[in-house]
Design a protein with these regions (language model features):
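C-terminal "post-core" interaction segments
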Residues: 31, 184-401
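Flexible, low-complexity junctional segments that flank or bridge functional domains
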Residues: 2-225, 231-233, 392-401
């Protein structure tokens, strides 16, 4: 009886400590949930009808945890992490499309210029539903991208659903080494035209080389520059900052803000406008995302450029790639982008100063033009909104293939 009494007092005392210490209670609940995970893991290993690989189970659990947050947080195993590092260097193998997951299938954000997918006729807003005859449903984004990659000069069959088209589109595309020449230029009369298709490590140097060649050819006859960011899915933040700085003398280009505005980082222009304040027009459309929107937003807010086209994609979140102990990494959404005027790009995009609809051959083009970050299930709400509502995350981030 005395032992029971002591035990009861101990239990009551433990409960009192727990109730009076919310953080302790929260930690206890977290540990209980981790124990639940371990319990499920062991039951699968012991009782599942087929043999399972421990590493694959854990990787699937990590993927599920990250992809439940928003469409852009994802796990990168060793192979995918290495692929990502190769992609940002500006040369990799694949088809040449920027993709994300939407409603269980692959959504094409934009095809990259002069790549196999581009020449095959893949368009922004297309849904890829099958790869080599296999349904995409049930695959993660990473698994689907892995299937699209392969040896150079081998063929892949993809099935595309294009809204506005009654029939599915079957394409056979030959894989190639994708050497992304992210900057191209030409001269039309006395106007310099510069096309940036993505933001890789070589983009800023490519832009400045292009401007130098234009200046050498036109000299004082140069009337202005057209900077084409249409169907540019984005890329490296530092390159977006440097490209913006190329046309600005001073001022903020973009700021990033973490949870509860605990950490605000501002990126400012360096002195020197490479085209001496000559006229600048920036072209955008619904395929202009992320880094493209940073450039367009900065030049628009500083009234340095006239932005022309249609509303951009609206991806205003920052993904930080965090290396893990397994030689893999996770890409985690850690902050929002804000333009110099304090506006968030998230789900809103950049609204052009002059709206010019692209030439469309049919209604499907109009439907594709409306594809945006906000249309993705699980997209994060705009932090400038007074009522953010609930986010329901069940899709994954973007990848190049």
């Amino acid at each position: 009886m005395r032992h029971f009494f002591k035990t009861t007092l101990y239990a009551i005392g433990f409960m009192s400590i727990t109730l009076s210490n919310p953080s302790f209670a929260a930690k206890t609940e977290t540990y209980n949930q981790l124990n639940l995970f371990a319990d499920v893991f062991e039951r699968i290993r012991a009782n599942y009808v087929k043999d399972v690989d421990d590493e694959e189970l854990i990787e699937a659990a990590i993927n599920g945890m990250l992809t439940s947050l928003d469409p852009h947080s994802t796990y990168l195993n060793t192979k995918r992490y290495e692929n990502m590092r190769v992609q940002t260097s500006g040369e990799f193998g694949g088809l040449g499309i920027e993709v994300t997951m939407d409603k269980g299938v692959i959504l094409v954000v934009a095809p990259m210029d002069d790549t196999p997918a581009f020449h095959a006729g893949v368009k922004a807003g297309d849904y890829i539903t099958k790869i080599d005859g296999e349904q995409i449903n049930g695959l993660t984004l990473n698994e689907a991208v892995d299937k699209m990659r392969g040896k150079v000069d081998t063929d892949i069959d993809i099935t595309i659903v294009r809204e506005g088209e009654s029939d599915v589109i079957e394409l056979t595309i030959t894989r190639a080494i994708i050497e992304v020449q992210s900057v191209r230029h030409r001269i039309e009369d006395e106007i310099g035209y510069v096309r940036i298709s993505s933001f890789t490590e070589k983009t800023t140097s490519g832009l400045r080389d292009a401007l130098k060649e234009i200046d050498e050819e036109l000299g004082d006859n140069l009337q202005g520059i057209v900077l084409d960011l249409r169907n540019n899915p984005g890329g490296l933040l530092d390159q977006a900052v440097d490209v913006s700085s190329t046309f600005l003398d001073r001022g903020e280009i973009v700021s990033t803000r973490t949870r509860n505005d605990k950490n605000i980082q501002r990126y400012n222009a360096k002195p020197g406008d490479n085209i001496d304040k000559k006229s600048l027009v920036v072209l955008i459309n619904g395929g202009s995302a992320s880094a493209s929107e940073i450039v367009a937003g900065a030049l628009q807010d500083h009234e340095r450029a006239v932005v022309v086209g249609t509303q951009s994609f609206g991806k205003g979140s920052v993904q930080t790639v965090m290396p893990l102990s397994t030689n893999g990494a996770m890409s985690l959404t850690t902050a929002y982008y804000f333009t110099p005027s304090g506006n968030s790009i998230q789900n809103e995009g950049i609204v052009p100063d002059v709206v010019v609809e692209q030439l469309r051959l049919n209604d499907s083009e109009a439907i594709r033009a409306r594809r945006s970050e906000a249309s993705l299930r699980g997209s994060l709400a705009n932090p400038n909104a007074t009522d953010e509502g609930d986010d329901e995350g069940d899709d994954e981030g973007e990848e190049d293939d």
